[in-house]
Amino acid sequence: MSIEALKTQLPAFAKDVKLNLSALPREDSLTEQQLYGLLVACGYTTRNGTVAQALEAEAAPHLSPAALDAAKAAASIMAMNNVYYRFTHLASNKAYETLPAKLRMSVIGNPGVDKVDFELWSLAVSAMNGCGRCIDAHEAVLREAGLSEAQIQTAVRVGAIIASAAVALEAAGAGFPEAAE
């Protein structure tokens, strides 16, 4: 499956989603690895198998096996970090911020791809998961590395488009097998 195949599964009410998905491969402010890694990381972050499989199929010809694995690693490690750090940030009891996390996250230090690309994928996933602390941390690293605000915004926009595709599928019943009964 690909973006084109995914679009055919979207309902009529999701015309804007289809148009936004169509524009993704033409995005030119990011490198090929950055863009296609975003498709994979954000696709898996939706937790929608149809979306994840379609975007991985679209991205695979453009990514090395190491980059494909790193994009999946960004989705999985941020799933953990976003829950944990969103809790420590939002909890009224600030003592939680002083406790050691005791979470293994060595992939962040050695992702197997350019660290800037991994940070960009992590930022988009963090935006999708709503972790303000992680968003700020990744955005600061990316700005320090020289990425522009427009490039950072593009990454988050890609995540937003992908999230909207998953919701459109689910709203149409494609993501809930029990809805077909």
UniProtKB/Swiss-Prot annotation:
InterPro entries: AhpD (IPR004674), AhpD-like (IPR029032), AhpD_core (IPR004675), CMD-like (IPR003779). GO terms for biological process: cell redox homeostasis; response to oxidative stress. Its EC number is 1.11.1.28. Disulfide bonds join C131-C134. It catalyses: N(6)-[(R)-dihydrolipoyl]-L-lysyl-[lipoyl-carrier protein] + a hydroperoxide = N(6)-[(R)-lipoyl]-L-lysyl-[lipoyl-carrier protein] + an alcohol + H2O. The keyword Transmembrane does not apply. Keywords: Antioxidant, Disulfide bond, Oxidoreductase, Peroxidase, Redox-active center. One of its GO terms (molecular function) is alkyl hydroperoxide reductase activity. Gene3D superfamilies: AhpD-like. The keyword Cytoplasm does not apply. It comes from the Bacteria. The active site is at C131, C134. Antioxidant protein with alkyl hydroperoxidase activity. Required for the reduction of the AhpC active site cysteine residues and for the regeneration of the AhpC enzyme activity. Belongs to the AhpD family. This is Alkyl hydroperoxide reductase AhpD. It comes from Azorhizobium caulinodans (strain ATCC 43989 / DSM 5975 / JCM 20966 / LMG 6465 / NBRC 14845 / NCIMB 13405 / ORS 571). The lineage of its organism: Bacteria, Pseudomonadati, Pseudomonadota, Alphaproteobacteria, Hyphomicrobiales.
